[in-house]
């Protein structure tokens, strides 16, 4: 697996980002000279430095003095001093998706797209192909617990990639197997309308070559409608839907382990294959659906059933996806990246099925624009939580929007019938608030894409300091 040699030093602007860090790591492991910069230290920056990659903190024109190629993500503004310097020097400037596409060009690729579930599904596909001795290269949008990283370089002919639709660049990725988990209104700052979001996913599937196939979840009505619009490409449908080609059956959500089976049917509706006794060591029907997508791909690529069953049973999950951070007095605390109403509802439903006590949701809304555009959905996605604690919005660089803040969300939840909603002043008050609500057997789920992950890891210790266990 090689790009042209002699590229010189490849500089990543924002190398600590989850998408950029994975590409940088794979290029480094291929033997290329890689360096980069980021605004702050982070776990990803530390990991890259431990690999021997030079990372500068802060953006400055001098950082690209020794660069021969500059890679940028869509988050990098045109006036970034490193981008300005690169263009002044007439250096090649490559978008993140273009560099990813260049890596993908050298392998057969499975690309996982969808508004939710991409990262977990990508990890599951990687685990199943690994179990089938495919030794895939993987670039994911989250840290895979089994690898301790979001990227790995494999010796096999296949590559598994999370396809980020947020800026439309997923349409540049050369894909032989496309997975679409769901399609919801999101990233409207780029697409402007939901119709354009759906059109982009249609193009994503139609870009698959004639010898490839798409795996699409028809439990989701928008995806089912999309299936009906796609011509001249092979589509394998999956879901609990009785019409699915690969059907999720016999789901049992008790005890934090998801037990299920998968039935494969031909176009005449006849069962041609069945895998039963699957056990996924994480809660939630949404995770069983993600696993079904991965199983559909693995089965199509001839991974044996016993390897599929073993890989699902040993699946280690993804960091920040229902990740247990600790326990205090019988209260278990979890960290989850969920920041869209559909994701939040799915996580809380899983928690409700797994918990023997109450479910306490602590949410840090991510971006004013998302809260504003999906306000009604946010007001109704916490039904499976006995208590909701709402923190101030994590701005992510945005300016406030009237009516889209913590207090309006608290009012909205109460107006929509929620019985227990508390406004949180800040993380320093979290232990006191949760300590007043939680009892042994309860689950506390910290939700959001911002700084709340740190709160989730600190909370068990803060609770212990505040209220020693009985």
Swiss-Prot record:
<keyword id="KW-0573">Peptidoglycan synthesis</keyword>
<dbReference type="InterPro" id="IPR004101">
    <property type="entry name" value="Mur_ligase_C"/>
</dbReference>
<keyword id="KW-0547">Nucleotide-binding</keyword>
<keyword id="KW-0963">Cytoplasm</keyword>
<dbReference type="GO" id="GO:0009252">
    <property type="term" value="P:peptidoglycan biosynthetic process"/>
</dbReference>
<keyword id="KW-0132">Cell division</keyword>
<feature type="binding site">
    <location>
        <begin position="114"/>
        <end position="120"/>
    </location>
    <ligand>
        <name>ATP</name>
    </ligand>
</feature>
<dbReference type="GO" id="GO:0005737">
    <property type="term" value="C:cytoplasm"/>
</dbReference>
<dbReference type="GO" id="GO:0071555">
    <property type="term" value="P:cell wall organization"/>
</dbReference>
<comment type="similarity">
    <text>Belongs to the MurCDEF family.</text>
</comment>
<dbReference type="Pfam" id="PF08245">
    <property type="entry name" value="Mur_ligase_M"/>
</dbReference>
<dbReference type="GO" id="GO:0005524">
    <property type="term" value="F:ATP binding"/>
</dbReference>
<dbReference type="Pfam" id="PF02875">
    <property type="entry name" value="Mur_ligase_C"/>
</dbReference>
<dbReference type="GO" id="GO:0008763">
    <property type="term" value="F:UDP-N-acetylmuramate-L-alanine ligase activity"/>
</dbReference>
<dbReference type="InterPro" id="IPR013221">
    <property type="entry name" value="Mur_ligase_cen"/>
</dbReference>
<keyword id="KW-0436">Ligase</keyword>
<keyword id="KW-0961">Cell wall biogenesis/degradation</keyword>
<comment type="function">
    <text>Cell wall formation.</text>
</comment>
<dbReference type="InterPro" id="IPR036565">
    <property type="entry name" value="Mur-like_cat_sf"/>
</dbReference>
<comment type="pathway">
    <text>Cell wall biogenesis; peptidoglycan biosynthesis.</text>
</comment>
<dbReference type="GO" id="GO:0008360">
    <property type="term" value="P:regulation of cell shape"/>
</dbReference>
<protein>
    <recommendedName>
        <fullName>UDP-N-acetylmuramate--L-alanine ligase</fullName>
        <ecNumber>6.3.2.8</ecNumber>
    </recommendedName>
</protein>
<dbReference type="InterPro" id="IPR000713">
    <property type="entry name" value="Mur_ligase_N"/>
</dbReference>
<dbReference type="GO" id="GO:0051301">
    <property type="term" value="P:cell division"/>
</dbReference>
<dbReference type="InterPro" id="IPR050061">
    <property type="entry name" value="MurCDEF_pg_biosynth"/>
</dbReference>
<keyword id="KW-0067">ATP-binding</keyword>
<dbReference type="InterPro" id="IPR036615">
    <property type="entry name" value="Mur_ligase_C_dom_sf"/>
</dbReference>
<dbReference type="InterPro" id="IPR005758">
    <property type="entry name" value="UDP-N-AcMur_Ala_ligase_MurC"/>
</dbReference>
<keyword id="KW-0133">Cell shape</keyword>
<dbReference type="Pfam" id="PF01225">
    <property type="entry name" value="Mur_ligase"/>
</dbReference>
<keyword id="KW-0131">Cell cycle</keyword>
């Amino acid at each position: 697996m090689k790009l042209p040699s002699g590229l010189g030093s490849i500089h990543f602007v924002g190398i600590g980002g989850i998408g950029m860090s994975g590409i940088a790591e794979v290029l480094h492991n291929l033997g290329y000279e890689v360096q980069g910069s980021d605004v702050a230290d982070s776990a990803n920056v530390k990991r890259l430095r431990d690999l021997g990659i030079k990372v500068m903190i802060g953006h400055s024109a001098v950082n690209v003095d020794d660069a021969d190629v500059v890679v940028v993500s869509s988050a990098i503004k045109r006036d970034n001093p490193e981008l300005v310097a690169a263009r002044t020097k007439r250096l090649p400037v490559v978008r993140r998706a273009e560099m990813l596409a260049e890596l993908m060009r050298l392998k057969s690729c499975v690309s996982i797209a969808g508004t939710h579930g991409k990262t977990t599904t990508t990890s599951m596909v990687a685990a199943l192909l690994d179990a089938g001795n495919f030794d895939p290269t993987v670039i994911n949008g989250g840290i895979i617990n089994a690898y301790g990283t979001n990227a790995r370089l494999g010796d096999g002919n296949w590559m598994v990639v999370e396809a980020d639709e947020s800026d439309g660049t997923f349409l540049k990725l050369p894909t032989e197997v496309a997975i679409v988990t769901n399609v919801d209104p999101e990233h409207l700052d780029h697409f402007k309308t939901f119709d354009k979001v759906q059109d982009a996913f249609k193009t994503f599937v139609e870009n698959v070559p004639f010898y490839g196939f798409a795996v699409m979840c028809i439990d989701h009505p928008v995806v089912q409608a999309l299936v009906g619009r796609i011509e001249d490409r092979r589509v394998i449908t999956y879901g609990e839907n009785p019409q699915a080609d690969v059907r999720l059956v016999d789901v049992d959500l008790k005890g934090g382990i998801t037990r299920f089976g998968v039935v494969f049917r031909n176009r005449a509706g006849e069962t041609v294959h069945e895998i039963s006794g699957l056990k996924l060591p994480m809660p939630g029907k949404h995770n069983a659906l993600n696993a079904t997508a991965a199983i559909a791909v693995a089965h199509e690529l001839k991974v044996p059933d016993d390897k599929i069953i073993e890989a699902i049973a040993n699946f280690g999950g993804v960091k920040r996806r229902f990740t247990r951070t600790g326990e205090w007095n019988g209260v278990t605390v979890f960290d989850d990246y969920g920041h869209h109403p559909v994701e939040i509802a799915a996580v809380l439903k899983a928690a409700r099925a797994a918990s023997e006590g109450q479910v306490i949701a602590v949410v840090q809304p991510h971006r004013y624009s998302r809260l504003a555009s999906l306000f009604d959905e946010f007001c109704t996605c916490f039904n499976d939580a006995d208590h909701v604690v709402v923190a101030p919005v994590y701005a992510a660089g945005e300016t406030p929007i009237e009516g889209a803040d913590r207090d309006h969300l608290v009012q909205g939840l109460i107006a929509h019938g929620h019985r227990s909603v508390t406004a949180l002043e800040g993380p320093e008050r979290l232990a006191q608030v949760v300590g007043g609500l939680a009892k042994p057997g309860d689950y506390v789920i910290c939700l959001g894409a911002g700084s709340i992950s740190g709160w989730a890891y600190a909370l068990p210790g803060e609770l212990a300091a505040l209220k020693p266990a009985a």
